[in-house]
Amino acid sequence: ARAAFYPKYYNCLMKKVLLVTRVSGFIPQHEMKHVRILQDMGYEVHYASDFNNVVYGKDNHRLDGTGVIRHQIDFVKSPFSRQVKKSYLQLVKLLMEEEFAMIHCHMPMSGVVGRLAAQKVYRQTGRHVPVLYTAHGLHFYTGAPLRNWLYYPVEYFLARYTDRLIVINHEDYDRVQSFPVRGCVVYVPGVGVPLPEETAPNARVMRKTTPKMLLSVGGLSARKNHQLMIEAMALLRDLDLRYVICGTGDKQKMLQQRILELGLEHRVFLAGYQENISEWLARADCFVLPSYQEGLPVAVMEAMAAGLPVIASDIRGVNDLIEHTKGGYLVQGFDPEDYAVKIRRMFTEKDAESAVPRDVRRNLMGEWNKKRVKQFSTQVVDQQMRALYQEVLQEDNAGRRRR
C-alpha cells in the first residue's frame, strides 16, 4: 500500500546495490546467482553497462523478468578515448540520483570509472558507498607485454578507493598483497561452475565413436589464440580428429581463411555462438585452450565438470585448475608443434610415459578433473559471495548508524 500511495517515499526506503560492467551480457552470463543472493537479502539490484555493446550472448533478453533495473552508461574499452569522461559523468549522475548501499564493479575500465565516480560522489556529498572490484584476471601478469603493465600504477592508485579487491587466481592474489587497499584483498575461486549429476565412471571409456572431437569454447579474438590450434591440426592429418570452436568474434574471417588455406575445411569447424555448450561438451573427447591470457577460465571449469581431459596453455589461471599429466597436459609456450605433440600423446594407443590405453587414460584424466573442479563450484563461490556481501553491507549499515 505504501508503494502505491507514496512511490517516491518507498523508492527512498528501498535498499539498492549497483553492479557495473563495461559491456552488456556479463551479469546474465556469469553473475545471476549473485544477483539472486542480493535480492534474497532484500536489495534491489541495478545494473550499469553499455547495453548497446552485447558481448556475452546475443542480446539483453536474459535480463527480462529478473527484476534487475538497467542503466545505460556509454563505457569504452580504451582508457585514452574521449568517451571515458562521458561515461564517468553519466555514472556520477546516476550515483547522485540513487542512494546505493554498495557498488560492485567488474572489468578493468568499468572498474576504473566506477571507483573514480564513487570517490567523486563522496567528495561532493560526504556519502561513502562501499566499492567492490572483481579483477577477472589482472592485465599485468607474468609474461605480459610491457604495455599491459601500464595498468599496474592505475590499479595500485585505485586500491585506496576499493573496499574489497576480489581476485580469482593465486598469481593475482600474491601480486596485489602490497597494494594500499582501503579494505582488504579477497580470493574467490572465479564465478563458479555448476556441477552436473554424477555419471557412470566408465561412460567416456565406452565411447568408441570416430572421429575423435577436440573442442574449444571462447570468443574468436587474438587473446584466445585459436589460430595456434588450427596450425596444430595441420600437423595431425594422420589422426582421425575433428576440431570445433564455439564462439564469435572479430577474428572469424581470418580464422576461416586460414582453415581454407590449410585445406582443413572438413576437419576444423567454426560453430559460432552456442547456448547449449553442455551438449557440445558431452560429444567432445578433449577440451583445448591455447589462450595467451586468462583469469580463471569458465570454459575450462565447464569442461572439467563434464569429465573431459584438457590440453591448455601453461598460464595464470589455467594452471590453477589443471594439474599436468593428471587432468590433461599444460603446454609451455605457443608453438603449434608442441600442441600437436600433446594431442598425439592424448590420442595414440600408448606413449613413453604410460602403458595405459588411450581411452582409459583420457577417462582417468576426466575423472580427476571432475573431482578437482568441486572446489570451484557455484555452491562454494555462492557461499563465499553471500558471506562477503553480508560483511560489506553490515559494515556500511553500522557506519550509517554512527553518522
Placement of each model-derived feature along the sequence:
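Conserved acidic donor-binding segment of nucleotide-sugar-dependent glycosyltransferases
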Residues: H324-T325, Y329-P336, R345-D351
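Donor nucleotide-sugar binding/catalytic pocket of nucleotide-sugar-dependent glycosyltransferases
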Residues: Y156-A200
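Short His-centered aromatic/hydrophobic patch
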Residues: C105-G111
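A conserved mid-protein helix/loop that constitutes part of the nucleotide-sugar donor-binding site
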Residues: P28-R36, K212-L235, D250-Q256, E337
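Short hydrophobic beta-strand element within catalytic cores of glycosyltransferases
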Residues: P309-A312
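Aromatic "clamp/platform" in nucleotide-sugar-dependent glycosyltransferases that forms part
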Residues: Y273, Y292
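A short, well-ordered alpha-helix in the C-terminal region of glycosyltransferases
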Residues: D338, A355-Q375, Q384-A387
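N-terminal strand-loop element at the rim of the active site
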Residues: L18-Q83, D172-F179, V185-Y187
